[in-house]
C-alpha cells in the first residue's frame, strides 16, 4: 500500500436538518417506492474537538459568530487653534462586547473518566477448580499488569477517545522487555486505521507526527506503519528539514516519503488496539447547548455592564450645573441652584424568564452529558442506595461505556499478555491461562459500606472468603491476599500443633526403670 493510500481516514460529521420531512406525500392505499434521502453533513475535524475542549477556542470568542458592536460618535471640527468651527464629523468605532466561555467540556470529560476508570480492570480465573500453578500464573499476570502501569495506559486511552474521538494503544518489545505507549491527537498524532473488509479486524495501522523547530516551523513529518509482522518508518522533510536527496527529488517533482527503517515488531499479530467514537468527543450532544449558554450569559453580562450601575439624573433649568471630576472621569461633586434636583435611576434586574432560560440551559448541559451536579447535603453521609440513585445518570452512562470499551480492552490484554510473557518467560503460561476480565463502573460509595456488605455476604454463605478477598483488593488487600491468608492459617496450625506436642512432652509421665 502506498503512503498516500495509507494516509486516508474517515472524517467526523455533524448531521444537518436539510430535507427533514420533505419527501412528498401519497395516498394510504397507494404503493410507492421509498424515496432516496441523502443526509447532508458538516465536516468536523479533531482540531475542532480541541477548540471545544479549551475555553479560549470557543465560538463565543469569535467576532464573526458573536460580533462586537459598532457605534457612531459625532465630534466637533476644530480649527488649528483648537476653536470650534461649528461643523461636526462622525467617527465609527468598535465597542468590544463581554465574552464568557466556560470549561463545561472539561467538567464532562473528567466526570466521564472518573466513572469509567475509577475502578481498576477486574480480572478473575474462569475455572471451577484452579490449580496451584494457575493461581501462581494468575498472580504473576496481575502483578505485571500493575508493574507496567496498564491502568494508566487504559486511562490515557480513554481520555484521548473521549476528548478527540479516537485513540490507540501500541505495544512493542525492546531488548526482550515489554513497553507501551498511547497515541492521541492531543499529543500531535494523527491515526490512520485500516480494516479487513471481511473480518472487520485491524490489518494495517499508521501514525503520522511531525518534528518542529524552535520557531514552530515544521521540519520533518514522520509516518510509522504497523502490519502483522513489521514496523515501517517513513520520513519526509519540510522546508529546512529536507535532506540533500529530498531537495534533488523535489526539483524533479518526486518529493514524498522515504523509507528509513523496517524491522520486525516481535508480535505474532498487529500489536495495536484502536478505538474510534463516531459521535465525536463525550460532550458532543451538549455542545450546541454549551454554545447557547455562553452567548446568553455574555449577553446578560453586556446588559449588566450597560444598565447594572445606577444612572444619575439632573433636573435643573439653564446652565447652573457645575460638575467636578477626578483624573479618571469619576464625578466627585455637583454644584446646582437652590431649586435644582438630583436623583438616581435604579439598575434593572434580570427578568425571571431570562434567568429561567439560563437555568434550563445549565441543567440540560448536565442532563445531555449524563453527568450529575452534586447537590448540597443538609446532613451526614447518604446510604449506598441513595448515592446510586443520585448518580444514576452517570452510572448508566458508565455502564454503556464499559460495554463499548470491552473490545478495546480485549486487544490491550492480548498485547500485554504476549509482550509481558516474553519479558518474564511465561508466554505459554499466559496464553493457556483461563481467565476473564471486564470493566466495572465506579460510583461514589463509602468503602466501609462495601466492606460491611462483603462481610455480611461471607457470614451468610453467599460468597466465599476468597471471592470477598478478590473484590476488596482495590481497597486494602494485594494481588496475592488469599495466598497470604492461607499461609497465615497454615502457620497458625503448625504453631498450634507444635504447642500441643510440647505440652504432651511435659505432661508425659517418666518411667524410672527405663534408664536402668
List the predicted regions and their residue ranges.
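Short amphipathic alpha-helical segments
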Residues: 133, 137, 145-153, 285, ...
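Extended, regular secondary-structure scaffolds
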Residues: 156-274
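Short linear motifs in intrinsically disordered
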Residues: 149, 155-162, 194-197, 224, ...
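Extended, helix-rich architectural segments
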Residues: 1-185, 511-516
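Extended, charged amphipathic alpha-helical segments
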Residues: 252-389
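Alpha-helix initiation and N-capping motif
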Residues: 47, 134, 138, 150-151, ...
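Glycine- and charge-rich intrinsically disordered segments
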Residues: 1-10, 291-301, 305, 495-516
